[in-house]
Amino acid sequence: MIMGASNAAPVIINCTGETFTPTKSGAISTWVWEICRSAQKQGVEPWVITRTRDAEPYAWPNTILLDYPWIPQMRGTGIGRLLQWQKQITGWGHVRQGAYARAVVQAIRERGLEHGPFVLHNDPEMAVHMRRCFPKSVIVHLFHNANPCSETYRRQFPGAVTVAAGVSDFICRWQENYFGIPAGTTKTIYNGVDLQQFTPSEKTPDGPPVISFLGRTDASKAPDLLLRAARKLARKTKDFSVQILGARFYWGSEPDDYQRLLDQLSSELEHDGISVRRPGVISRSAVPGELRKAQIHVVPSRWDEPFGLATVEGMASGLAVVASRTGGTAEVVGDAGFLFERESEDELAGHLATLLEDKKLRGEYGRLARARAEKFTWDETWSVIRDAIQA
């Protein structure tokens, strides 16, 4: 790894597919915004370089919006196969990735930011490209999830970065194995949560206990598993309801087989006498209030969730948490919640039944979850980032 040190404001470079808006962006966008806010408290104002989008960006003064041709992947078409062929030639995951990298470097040079330090996300190809262009700069690369790349960039990545980091120990171990980085040399930089925004409800909501899901409604996040477990619960008790917060995409849903499956399972659960609320896309500002309507928070992910923001946001809201034992989730939840094996709707239903049957236990695990969440703050995340760029 390249060594270096810097006391300058970092230049945070969004990954190729991400944008920087409070309404039509994902978790990395939230990370960038929260880190900027925490840095500002200490008199540091990072630069943010990101792709533009047809939505109002976060109101951050040092934002550089890049408007470059957005080329779809077009899988299964002749053009799509041609784009895959270029990957074998250039090593870039997609032609738009190379276009974005060139636009980023141009923007950096135009504004005299060549000395960095640079903070990158989920973009090992970009890290290698940046090292070629800025050989003496500090480059911190943070993996938010497992993001493989071509063999060319896989070999070059370890030598391109000053600090190789991940949002959990789980993703750091993946990174070491995948890139051949010596064990224990990657840096864990946990995500955070806004403890002033995500707070427990001051009083128990009226009505039956609400079991909540928050996130994208796709198969990897597995809201269907919650609905299936809820159907099993409904055979024993009708004293609960379910809310599914989110949509297939950050900006809404389009009909597909999985969304139709969720429709079917929701209808069957309502036929069983259980209310199911699915409001669709929830704006970031509305999420804390929506979570406070619930008493139990379920994270049923099938995929290896490295550090889900939805997990820690539910915990900070004082909800009893039940999550699948995948990826880094056990690191986040610790002993402050219930874990179940991937795909086990029976085990999930059992944990939910335990919490529904015992209001006192539900409250106790809600308090444990909040206390655990208080260990993960954005100020602490920024502190670790600051130390990394000054190393």
Model-predicted regions and their roles:
Residues 95-99, 360-390:
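A charged, aromatic-enriched C-terminal amphipathic alpha-helix characteristic of glycosyltransferases
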Residues 165, 204-221, 226-231, 242-245:
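Conserved donor-binding/catalytic core segment of Leloir-type glycosyltransferases
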Residues 170, 192:
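Carbohydrate-associated surface elements
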Residues 256-285:
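Nucleotide-activated donor-binding/catalytic signature segment of Leloir-type glycosyltransferases, i.e.
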Residues 326-339:
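Short acidic/histidine- and often glycine-rich active-site loop of Leloir-type glycosyltransferases
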